[in-house]
């Protein structure tokens, strides 16, 4: 079970340790002793914390500032407030994916984009709004050019977009964190075009069925569905 959870849904050692009810240091010791068929490439970030990649997207400077976002959103007290971002393959052209992370539950929705342009992102957000309805209340984004159609998005969905300050990833910390987990399934350099729709669906399932320590080891989908009932 330990090897399966680390290699397939790509859980962290701490997540596995909680489920099997042993100390996470014990699992590390077993790996070091060669008792488990796990190596460093199977671990989150391959055991290495990497520097943030240099930003290559175009940007713009308009839109509603995150400073105007209600405090209840910042405090994660209410559901329905998402952060959005783009994850690229590492190539300058080709498909990408959009990631939408609900701030309260960390529910993560990954959608395919035909490109890194505003038309592709606008289509993805409109689809998301149609799927979630009233459960999509706001979006917090950066100033990447893919969000340049924010006026159109707000007009068609009624969902306000809040723009984080430039070079301030912590203002979209949920998105940054979940994107790092996503990279375990879509390594940088892997063409998004090679990922099938079924594989993308499975990645969404894996991301939302991972027990999180911040929720006392409940999963994002559990928290999200519970919030819908109250």
Where are these regions (language model features)?
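C-terminal domain-tail junction helix/linker
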Residues: 188-230
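Secondary-structure boundary/capping micro-motif
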Residues: 1-166, 170-174, 184-191, 205, ...
């Amino acid at each position: 079970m330990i090897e399966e959870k680390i290699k397939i849904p790509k859980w962290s050692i701490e997540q596995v340790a909680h489920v099997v009810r042993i100390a996470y240091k014990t699992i590390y010791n077993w790996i070091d002793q060669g008792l488990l068929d796990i190596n460093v490439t199977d671990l989150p970030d391959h055991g290495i914390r990497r520097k943030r990649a240099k930003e290559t997207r175009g940007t713009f400077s308009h839109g509603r500032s995150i400073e105007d976002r209600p405090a209840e959103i910042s405090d994660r007290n209410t559901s329905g407030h998402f952060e959005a971002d783009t994850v690229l393959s590492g190539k300058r052209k080709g498909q990408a994916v959009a990631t939408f992370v609900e701030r309260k539950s960390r529910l993560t929705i990954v959608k395919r984009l035909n490109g890194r342009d505003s038309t592709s992102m606008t289509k993805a957000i409109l689809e998301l709004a149609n799927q979630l309805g009233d459960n999509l209340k706001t979006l917090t984004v950066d100033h990447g050019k893919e969000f340049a159609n924010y006026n159109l998005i707000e007009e068609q969905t009624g969902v306000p977009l809040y723009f984080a300050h430039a070079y301030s990833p912590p203002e979209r910390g949920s998105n940054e964190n979940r994107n790092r987990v996503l990279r375990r399934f879509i390594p940088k350099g892997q063409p998004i075009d090679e990922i099938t729709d079924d594989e993308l669906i499975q990645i969404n399932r894996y991301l939302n069925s991972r027990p999180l320590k911040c929720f006392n080891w409940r999963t994002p989908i559990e928290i999200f569905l519970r919030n819908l009932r109250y």
